[in-house]
Amino acid sequence: MSRSFDDLLPTALDDISLAELSPLTRVGDLLILLERWVERGWLRALDKAFVAFLSDLDPQADPLVLVAAALTSHQLGHGHVCLDLYETLKEPDFALSLPPEGDQQGGTMLLPSQLLAALDGAAWCQALAGSMLVAEVGDSSAEALQKPLVLAERRLYLRRYWTYERRIAAALRQRLAQSETPPEDLPQRLNALFGPANSAPQAIIDWQKLSCALATRKGFSIITGGPGTGKTTTVVRLLALLQAPAVQSGQPLRIRLAAPTGKAAARLTESISQQVQSLDVSDDVRQKIPSEVTTVHRLLGSRPGTRYFRHHAGNLLPLDVLVVDEASMIDLEMMANLLDALPPHARMVLLGDKDQLASVEAGAVLGDLCRDAEEGFYSPDTQAWLEAVSGEDLGKGGLRQGDAQQHPLAQQVVMLRHSRRFGQGSGIGQLARLVNQQQDQQARTLLAAGSHDDLFALALKGEQDLKFERLVLDGLGRGEQGPQGYRHYLNVLTAERPADDSALDDACWTRWARSVLSAFDAFQLLCAVRKGPWGVEGLNQRITHALFNAKLIESEQQWYEGRPVLMTHNDYGLGLMNGDIGITLRLPERDGEGKQVLRVAFPRNDGSEGVRFVLPSRLNEVETVYAMTVHKSQGSEFAHTALILPEALNPVLTKELIYTGITRAKHWFSLIEPRQGIFEEALRRKVKRLSGLMLGL
């Protein structure tokens, strides 16, 4: 019978002084320390349980192995696929996010830096290599395949994530080695879709045209670019480029479109629907270009309550082309599942912004795969072929030349470089570029200048500064056509409410709900963290209180009319996905007796402009969403976006987080700072998610 973690702990926890512990030489002492870390919120209960499991497997396990396992599991929760043993030893506390955000407790708690102070990287690796719990790369014996940990030089993995990484790498190598046959008249087809190349010396390279050309060569390609660079326009033309010859041959391609969230899928559905209609192609081709976008989970056929899908290597997806939008949100496990379920002959095209935040779950797949996108690294053969079929002069692009053997993946990646949404005169566009380049002083100067109508910076003087409430409630005070706050959608809710005697099945209720949902998209407050006075939890309470005091909402209780909620998990029974936003409204009861009940209105996200009304009692996995994390905002856009930073520097504060927050704004962006300087400190830090995915790619 397996022992629980509690069984492994000495009973007199409170009687043992932390100073007397020897956690790197005695397993019992290590377990006591880990329990204390869990009590303080430094480790997850899951990390603790994993160590208990390993101790059960090997009662003689070296504490060095167990502490490495605990930290690897902990890092997984922070998005890292593996633990780099040497990097961890350089700056243990910050590298491990220990103590975590918001921990203000004092005391004599043993920190990772103290625990690991005398440890040498080589000795740590040696201890792991000698453990019965750890398999080394290259050992494919039956015994090794049963070991829960994998050591790859200086990187330690949980076996499952090592397997995901290798499955992705193997699938990509297979697709990159597999040449497709582009149409013989590819140059003419490209010119028909994009126009002939401009030979003027100052002409801008048509990167959209190049990305479509490259996608015809192999079974895998990536189109990356920032907001407004035309990723959707490009993919619509790519689908026309691929589908036209197939339709003409009488064998149209089966094309599927997917996105990670319901909101991202709805945005792409709407955008593609509009653009397909304006394509200069025959009606036969137009009819075979799909506009309906599904979520990745629905595409694969998610099995509720499990991590398995209906489609997998033994039951492949019935398609010839798969396009995945917002690919930066796809984590390592999901990418492995997608590639497993893809037929060998099918093409896969990833769309996304490589500079956005990585997925919430482990991995930074798009960022890893686009590592060379900025500089190109096209081989002479790739460049010559692109120039021949497109007429473009890549010599003007300032790219670095590469070797197809050393950079096989780079040959199938194109970065779109010209934003049509944020032109040279856009303050948002300029700020996003400066943030991406980590030009912190220039970014501060731009914000301080006040010379752009679409940028605003608010420095707060303490937690009770009323300027925060004014911005969140009323925006920037420039009237109905300017940047709004939350008063706007609540005014729409009140002003446009249908007559009370309207029947529930009257279309006026759906029109009203759509109007309120649209008005809510006029403003969104984004946070970097969840905890503390400047985190999601505290700010949602504060804004709710401010709206109640302003008599804009009727209650501060859990459910009230006007409450905006965010789905935090998928609910397939209700057809709602993680990230979907709904607004609580008061509607007539179905029995028509004149009573009204609260229902939550969610957009149907299928391009139909429909609304799904759900009783609050059926929504178990929702939270109030006046404030949401930047992570949760990915795939969404808001007319006016405000980003509030915490006072203290935190590992999540990076230039990627700031960039993602800025680029959620369509028309106006506001930066809110409780402390001057935190913006610059964040810009100097980059996300570095540890993985070995690019080895060999």
Annotate the PLM regions.
Residues 3-16, 21-185, 328:
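N-terminal accessory nucleic-acid engagement/regulatory domains that precede
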Residues 88, 168, 261, 295, ...:
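Residue-level signature of catalytic and energy-coupling elements of molecular machines
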Residues 183-206:
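N-terminal pre-Walker A segment at the start of P-loop NTPase domains
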Residues 200-216, 512-513:
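Pre-Walker A adenine-sensing motif
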Residues 210-212, 216-452:
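ASCE P-loop NTPase helicase motor core
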Residues 343, 558-561, 577, 633:
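Residue-level recognition of short, solvent-exposed, well-ordered loop/turn junctions
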Residues 355, 359-565, 571-573:
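Conserved helicase motor core of P-loop NTPases
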Residues 437, 580-697:
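C-terminal accessory regions
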